[in-house]
């Protein structure tokens, strides 16, 4: 088995989490269980949880490192989603 450098594997996991976290957040948004203003916080929490779950994958870092990486990926995923959907202009319309 070829060993990768820790930093490269962490970037792979974070990239995956940046893509997956907004999918989970959108599913939660559709249920309307969480007000829109809390979705960025939910995204960070989901990223942290997914990061913790990724601890069990080969080549992952410590639990604390993976939770931190997941939380950063959740924050990044929210930022990317906001950028692509341009919600910043209509944010007030989404609040319930």
Curated annotation (Swiss-Prot):
Highest taxon in the source lineage: Viruses
Organism: Listeria phage A118 (Bacteriophage A118)
Regions of this protein lying in the Cytoplasmic compartment: 1-32, 82-96
Functional note: Isoform Antiholin: Counteracts the aggregation of the holin molecules and thus of pore formation.
Keywords carried by this UniProt record: Cytolysis, Host cell inner membrane, Host cell lysis by virus, Host cell membrane, Host membrane, Membrane, Transmembrane, Transmembrane helix, Viral release from host cell
Entry keyword annotation includes Transmembrane: yes
Chief place where the protein resides: host cell
Lineage: Viruses, Duplodnaviria, Heunggongvirae, Uroviricota, Caudoviricetes
Annotated membrane topology: Multi-pass membrane protein
Domain free text: Isoform Holin has 3 transmembrane regions whereas isoform Antiholin lacks the first transmembrane region.
Residues passing through the membrane, by range: 33-55, 61-81
Localization of this protein: Host cell inner membrane
Protein name in UniProt: Putative antiholin
A Pfam family that the UniProt record links to this protein: Phage_holin_5_1
Primary gene name: hol
Periplasmic side: 56-60
GO cellular component, one term: membrane
GO BP of this protein: killing of cells of another organism
